[in-house]
């Protein structure tokens, strides 16, 4: 058994986060979960919108247009390792907090800019949200049922998949490079860039059952009978993802599916008919019975669990995917580290106290 350190792998990292929405706070949450000390610059009077995503911050209410506020922020950033901001391009420059100014004062600063469209390009100054950003990458066009409008996939794909995850990776890469050069740099983390990168698998596939330009028609897009969701007798739902022949065979055997489904699994001409037959089969039993038959096997099966019930699923409980902290259920820090695990910490100090300590070398 590895001996656990007191804090996560980013212990000692000093981060200044400017209040924002969506992916920016998620970046700071991930860094804080893994041990970074995060001072959050907030507008005076701000009330936390999401206590889970905004956890483990040392808050400072700052008027960025006042002399006092400017002095405080510049002092904080003189000692910080990382800055995270999500304003439109040019806002930080107009506040006197652009990269040229701050990197001159602190050449080791990693300056992370989290936006939808990026720092340049014809759409850089346009308003937008997750749905708009993924719309121009080709991702949204492929999500939904055949002959119907695209379905917004929450804001997982853009804000958090192509946004905060890539921004965090960029920050860590810049910190790693800083160990060699001694210099910080700007990380331009645009959601459109991240989502395009997420789509590399699809852009790289030839036109086939895996990649099609028709919505709802690909193997992974919901057309295949062995990779989709089905309704059960009680109205609850299940997911099946039995792509490989051996897993498909196990699904059919354990579910006691019609014999004819065993032939022609990968022939798209069969998919509509086979989908109807599996849909009828899954309607014969409630979800709990299908769970007893299929969960934990090689049938590639899982029940569709509502958001508010996810923490109670046996596997999620066994993994400790949710933790209780401060009287609230929180998502656990991820990923897991065997020697320096992340943890959810209290925000015991206010931001001004933390910056004062940084200024004194602490």
Segments from the language model and where they lie:
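Flexible, small-/acidic-enriched active-site or ligand-binding loops
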Residues: 2-6, 325-362
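A structured beta-alpha segment of the ubiquitous adenosine-cofactor-binding alpha/beta core
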Residues: 4, 16, 53-105
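Conserved small-residue-rich beta-alpha loop and adjacent elements
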Residues: 7-46
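Active-site-adjacent "lid/gating" segments in soluble enzymes
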Residues: 30-34, 95-238, 242-243, 342
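Conserved dinucleotide-binding and phosphotransfer motif residues
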Residues: 34, 79, 297
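Active-site loop/turn elements of alpha/beta-hydrolase fold enzymes
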Residues: 36, 43, 64, 89, ...
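Aromatic-enriched alpha-helical interface/lid elements that frame and gate functional surfaces
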Residues: 226-297, 301
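A glycine-rich dinucleotide-binding beta-alpha-beta segment and adjacent secondary-structure elements
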Residues: 295-344
């Amino acid at each position: 058994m590895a001996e656990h350190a007191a804090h996560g792998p980013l212990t000692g990292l000093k981060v200044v986060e400017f209040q924002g929405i969506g992916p920016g706070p998620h970046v700071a949450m991930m860094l804080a979960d893994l041990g970074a000390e995060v001072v959050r610059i907030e507008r005076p009077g701000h009330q936390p919108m999401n206590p889970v995503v905004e956890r483990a911050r040392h808050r400072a209410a700052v008027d960025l247009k006042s002399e006092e506020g400017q002095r405080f922020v510049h002092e904080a950033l003189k000692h910080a390792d990382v800055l995270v901001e999500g304003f439109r391009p040019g806002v930080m420059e107009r506040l006197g907090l652009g990269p040229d100014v701050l990197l001159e004062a602190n050449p080791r600063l990693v300056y992370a800019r989290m936006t939808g469209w990026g720092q340049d390009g014809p759409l850089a100054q346009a308003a937008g949200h997750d749905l708009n950003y993924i719309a121009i990458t080709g991702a949204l066009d492929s999500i939904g049922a055949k002959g119907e409008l695209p379905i917004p996939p929450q804001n997982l794909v853009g804000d958090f998949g192509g946004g905060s995850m890539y921004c965090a990776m960029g920050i860590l890469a810049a910190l790693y490079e800083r160990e060699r050069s001694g210099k910080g740099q700007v990380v331009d983390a645009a959601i459109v860039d991240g989502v395009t990168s997420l789509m590399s698998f699809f852009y790289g596939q030839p036109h086939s059952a895996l990649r099609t330009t028709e919505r709802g028609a690909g193997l992974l897009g919901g057309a295949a009978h062995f990779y989709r969701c089905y309704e059960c007798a009680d109205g609850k739902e299940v997911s099946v993802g039995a792509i490989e022949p051996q897993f498909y065979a196990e699904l059919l055997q354990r579910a006691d599916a019609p014999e004819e489904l065993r032939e022609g699994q990968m022939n798209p001409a069969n998919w509509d008919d086979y989908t109807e037959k599996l849909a009828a089969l899954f309607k014969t039993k409630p979800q709990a019975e299908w769970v007893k038959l299929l969960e934990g096997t090689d049938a590639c099966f899982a029940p569709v669990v509502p958001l508010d019930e996810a923490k109670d699923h046996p596997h999620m409980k066994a993994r400790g995917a949710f933790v209780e902290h401060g009287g609230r259920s929180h998502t656990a820090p991820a990923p897991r580290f065997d020697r320096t695990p992340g943890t959810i910490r209290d925000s015991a100090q206010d931001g001004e106290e933390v910056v004062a300590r940084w200024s004194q070398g602490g």
